[in-house]
Amino acid sequence: MLIKEYHILLPMSLDEYQVAQLYMIQKKSREESSGEGSGVEILANRPYTDGPGGNGQYTHKVYHVGSHIPGWFRALLPKAALQVEEESWNAYPYTRTRYTCPFVEKFSIEIETYYLPDGGQQPNVFNLSGAERRQRIVDTIDIVRDAVAPGEYKAEEDPRLYRSAKTGRGPLADDWARTAAQTGPLMCAYKLCKVEFRYWGMQAKIEQFIHDVGLRRVMLRAHRQAWCWQDEWIELSMADIRALEEETARMLAQRMAKCNTGSEGPEAQTPGKSSTEARPGTSTAGTPDGPEAPPGPDASPDASFGKQWSSSSRSSYSSQHGGGVSPQSLSEWRMQNIARDSENSSEEEFFDAHEGFSDSDEVFPKEMTKWNSNDFIDAFASPTEVEGVPDPTVMATKGIEDGARAPRDSEGLDGAGDLVVEACSVHALFLILHSGSILDSGPGDTNSKQADVQTLSTAFEAVTRVHFPEALGHVALRLVPCPPICAAAYALVSNLSPYSHDGDSLSRSQDHIPLAALPLLATSSSRYQGAVATVIARTNQAYAAFLRSSEGTGFCGQVVLIGDGVGGILGFDALCHSASAGPGSRGSSRRGSMNNEMLSPEVGPVRDPLADGVEVLGRASPEPSALPAQRTFSDMANPDPDGSQNSLQVASTATSSGEPRRASTASCPPASSEAPDGPTNAARLDFKVSGFFLFGSPLGLVLALRKTVMPALEVAQLRPACEQIYNLFHAADPCASRLEPLLAPKFQAIAPLAVPRYQKFPLGDGSSLLLADTLQTHSSLFLEELEMMVPSTPTSASGAFWKGSELGNEPASQTAAPSTTSEVVKILDRWWGNKRIDYSLYCPEALTAFPTVTLPHLFHASYWESADVVAFILRQVIEKERPQLTECEEPSIYSPAFPREKWQRKRTQVKIRNVTSNHRASDTVVCEGRPQVLNGRFMYGPLDVVTLTGEKVDVYVMTQPLSGKWIHFGTEVTNSSGRLTFPVPSERALGIGVYPVRMVVRGDHTYAECCLTVVSRGTEAVVFSIDGSFTASVSIMGSDPKVRAGAVDVVRHWQDSGYLIVYVTGRPDMQKHRVVAWLSQHNFPHGVVSFCDGLTHDPLRQKAMFLQSLVQEVELNIVAGYGSPKDVAVYAALGLSPSQTYIVGRAVRKLQAQCQFLSDGYVAHLGQLEAGSHSHAPSGPPRAALAKSSYAVAAPVDFLRKQSQLLRSRGPSQVDREGPGTPPTTLARGKTRSISLKLDSEE
């Protein structure tokens, strides 16, 4: 729901305004009702008593809005849904208006208005709650200074020009409000408008459209008219107004009756009747004020659009079950299904916009900039597009005081100067390549593009504020408008439609437009080359403008590109050209050179204009200089039958060298502000691109066409100048296509990765996005000749083809087939990044029943408001930020409260100079009400060779884990052995829950992390021995142990059943980072982890002591234990019965009476647990639920990846350069080199 409070000032008294308002409404109803699709019917207008506001006038109207709704959206709706009913209660100076449409149950508008004799200074007229006030946007409408739409301006309605002949008032100057406040009269209409449209993919866009076009635009014009028509109403009384209203009602009834009789027949009468049948439970959120939210075509379309659609749609139900299925009933069924989908799947899961945060205190930004969705009006006159880059849309991350007005567009850049800071606070710049939907027929409206970017910006802030607080204020968005290259193709294909000659609605309701052909035709045009050059120039302009702005001064962060369907194609080719145009291009390899000719038949084989002036291609023979320089960028995919050496510029960027895939950072002259006619020598991006996100782009089809017309072309050779490409799409999107099968054909058998739903997994579900992990999981597809010894399960992927010698003793598993191994290496080398490329987004199944021609608009709108998309992007960008630290730095993602200080001891700086931190803190479990004590040890070096003695350590606790805010609890000094004990003050004792703890060394900001778990008495727990119950291979030699099949599922079953998970291991605590990272790598559920205190000869004794302390001091009730035969005695000492002790592995005869051996493995055991799940429910006292999550969610760790094996063919030097991988995000970076008991090796 979008809530705005409008303040409308007028220089008149309240009594005058009452007459002016009612006169204006009835006059606009007369003038702007033209009949079917645009008009107003007044069904009732009578006084009431004891209603809203006391006694007043009740009005019931029907708005006809069909002609004011975009054609693609109109195709989704039956005619009955194009009528909106309005009920208003006017108890002046209080009014209330409600718009209803039973057909669209999850759409509602509600407006409350107070008319007060002041200047609009009252901050909370409507007594809103704190959450509502944070969500509310205050917008002051100035009838003089605010601009009206170009097609609506009339000189006689301009307050700057109007002077009343009867009252002598006017004209009004720009400072009229200040003058009226001093001299009077002055009044203010406070209008609280609530708009809700809870349908997937359209929520944010339509809610904002209703506010900006249906409410604000209508109210601005209506109040300008009310002022400028004062000579007509100044002498009227309320009795005269009522008489005019009755006359208007009769006139409108006659006009609509004629129209209905001539076109619709009796169906038009249904709306009026159905209004009395409207269900009282229909959602009625709000929008513009009833009386003013005018009746006319301007008002009604917008307001009407916001209003609701007549319940006469129910009449189609009978026709659906009567004789045949009509198009109207099909439309009803589609919308009902999309609404029903939302109900069945729970609204929190179904609606992808960030609406769900309305009740949170810290969710809503304090400032939300206004924007206009003018693209929803088909015939709206938009100003000519200005060459160059429009006013940038900046993410509203810097809050303002509550109630402050959102800045006007003209004030946006001026205000930016106030945001100057000493250092650039922006760490990631997003450049949005926005071209529009492939079905856009016009030149593209800049305001519409800015509206989409503002929607994305709002979604960014909402998600960032809740789950990525470290990124708040460090992200900026800029719009790069791209040419609508598909417009000409759409016009051409529309003319070829079998129904192009038919003007009725049949052609709109049928899917006769081949959507897949549009991008293919567009990229084959002779003008496509210029479009790519224009995109490069505008992108460079946007980047340069950002650097010149106060926000971008000193910017040195990463630049990310986001491209919509068409913008993604243009951006991809721009990146490919940038990769080949830069100095030292990889295109110098002969391998990348391809023969080609023009795709367009009218132009013969010519030189690629994008390659003009670029002499780094290393062709075998020079190209003739006499060849003309005109050629389309897309035509580079054609073979040259004459065998000429015309090289495919885009394809020529790929080589077999091991050079890193990154854009050249060499400087180049800035692009000109005007879009060039053709690419120049400097037609490349001026900056390095870290990631490129595609939103439903048909890029795969375009590349497939180039591959088809040029069989010798290898798509993988089109190396875009970015580090990673992410192809996001909905499975039902008819415009989207995959990319991975073009790079590796066998990926057609591998499903795209599913982007986790934000409502369930805001920080991700722990699934690995790495290409190497996918190749490992699906190794059977790529290593067919290799015998796999360990089955691949959802929780355990065999690493057979990475380390053939570790599978077993069989000779077949010693080495992999050379051909298949080289294929895997080839895929890794040719891939566009190190992660998967194709990602599938959630969409309702009901969308498959919608007309195909309506889906491109719907899906294009859905990306900008999708919290799933925003959270996914933030996870990738923030993850990208963390590995950029140097090896001696810590991956801290927050700013500690205290800056670095000098060491307390002078020797400390010398002792730790060449060693890496290996701090660790023990997970602590305490019973509620008992003292809470945290313990940590601060050491440096792989074997704890240096002890941090006598230094300050700050203790931070995340008291609200979802908030991401670290609270400083205190400071302690380490003792002579590097240990620290910190008792939590009693006044700050924490309640039941799991709390992350971070202990930060004041001197260098390295830190240790652990969890403080507070439980109630009698909490039931399950214990797992890591080495005894999880590992399927011995890890003494330093290899990464495999996970037993089904182990993760068993642990997750116990956690889902409500038990506390406890992990124990006999490994020394110096290996904590590696063990927890291993658990994270395999998605084990979060739990308490216990280690031995240093190296010990009796680890079982320490295990037993730890578990005994849990039972005696914490009062845990351990109900089951898993481990190896060595752990039987430990569990027996705890009092566990044989039926509660589960041992994995071969049965030992002497222990058969003391435990249960799981000889059939975890998979069979899990089936037994699930079959008797009712008997495993916790029987303890009721308690607050502890967090249920995976280690991989809290700490996406990938520094355990076996890069030494994955990259073996690339040579040891590159492995050394790239390092062992990425450190865990919530674990201190450790480079432990233990002599024994290692989980992984580091080269």
Curated annotation (Swiss-Prot):
GO function terms (MF aspect): calcium ion binding; phosphatidic acid binding; phosphatidylcholine binding; phosphatidylinositol binding; phosphatidylinositol transfer activity; phospholipid binding; receptor tyrosine kinase binding
Domain DDHD: start-end pairs: 684-878
PTM sites of type Omega-N-methylarginine: R1210, R1217
Compositional bias per record (Low complexity), positions renumbered to this chain: 299-319, 581-593
UniProt biased composition (Polar residues): 271-283, 643-658
Post-translational modification: Phosphorylated on multiple sites by CDK1 at the onset of mitosis. Phosphorylation facilitates dissociation from the Golgi complex and is required for interaction with PLK1.
Modified residues (Phosphothreonine): T59, T282, T287
Region of interest called Disordered, as start-end residue ranges on this chain: 259-330, 581-679, 1206-1243
Modified residues (Phosphoserine): 300, 304, 319, 326, 329, 342, 345-346, 373, 382, 593, 600, 621, 895, 1236
Catalysis performed (reactions): a 1,2-diacyl-sn-glycero-3-phospho-(1D-myo-inositol)(in) = a 1,2-diacyl-sn-glycero-3-phospho-(1D-myo-inositol)(out)
Bilayer disposition of the protein: Peripheral membrane protein
Role description: Catalyzes the transfer of phosphatidylinositol (PI) between membranes. Binds PI. Also binds phosphatidylcholine (PC) and phosphatidic acid (PA) with the binding affinity order of PI > PA > PC. Regulates RHOA activity, and plays a role in cytoskeleton remodeling. Necessary for normal completion of cytokinesis. Plays a role in maintaining normal diacylglycerol levels in the Golgi apparatus. Necessary for maintaining the normal structure of the endoplasmic reticulum and the Golgi apparatus. Required for protein export from the endoplasmic reticulum and the Golgi. Binds calcium ions.
The protein's assembly and partners: Interacts with PTK2B via its C-terminus. Interacts with RHOA. Has higher affinity for the inactive, GDP-bound form of RHOA. The CDK1-phosphorylated form interacts with PLK1. Interacts with VAPB and PIK4CA.
Family annotation (PANTHER family): MEMBRANE-ASSOCIATED PHOSPHATIDYLINOSITOL TRANSFER PROTEIN 1, PHOSPHATIDYLINOSITOL TRANSFER PROTEIN
Protein name, entry field: Membrane-associated phosphatidylinositol transfer protein 1
Gene name of this polypeptide: Pitpnm1
